[in-house]
């Protein structure tokens, strides 16, 4: 949980830096921005699962509910999505709502994390929020009733899927994070295209894109391709990475992993070894084989992402 403590601390410092001051009387009831509606509903859903698990004495599941919400939904996505709107250059009309919702979620998250991690949460509650009452004796939050907006859920989940796919392409093809890319989108589904248009600035900022273009023709030769729902996306790689070198690198990695898998399979098919080796050793070998298979699949996916049509 050391990394989780750091995550909580960094989230708090980010809000402090961006002047997200907590108002104890604030309640996120009438929200305009879909990102805020999404995170509040995610928090409501987490509270429901948390209380169900606590009432059933499933403390491990309860801790997992909090961990996944705060790390994934709040830090990895919500904070990332609102960063461009909180920057000094931002002219977003939703900046006040972002500040209120982000601090409201953080404070109430500290309350439910407190029984599992009392020291860091009490410290932040006192130093950042100025709380005079200890979290351990304060009332736990209740779901904040707002419109359960499926439009918000569908919009943000699609946005997250698109950003994730772009991240995967960068990672698998070793494209430097700061390297500006062009995103091409090929699809006639107006709903998804309207979402992309709506969040274009956020997508470009988070994914380090120079532009987003809608096309009706095939992707250019040497484009990394992916699928997000019904959308086909492409990222032209010409001038970004050396395609020939990248193909050679990926094929070498695949051959290396295939040799590892072969060795693992030979040992696991050896009945003499299986009968004599401790169960722990056999299981570790199986885990290593499975990890190598997963790695091979990812390398093949990376190789297949590059479109080499002549």
Q: Where is each model-derived feature located?
A:
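Structured ligand/cofactor/substrate-binding pocket environments in proteins
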Residues: 1-15, 64-68, 99-122, 194
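Short helix-adjacent coil turns
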Residues: 54-61
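C-terminal low-complexity, glycine/proline- and small-hydrophobic-enriched intrinsically disordered tails
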Residues: 127-310
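Non-cofactor substrate-recognition interfaces
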Residues: 14-36, 224-233, 245, 275
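Core structural elements
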Residues: 3-16, 36-45, 64-84, 226-229, ...
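Acidic, turn-prone loop/beta-hairpin segments
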Residues: 22-51, 79-164
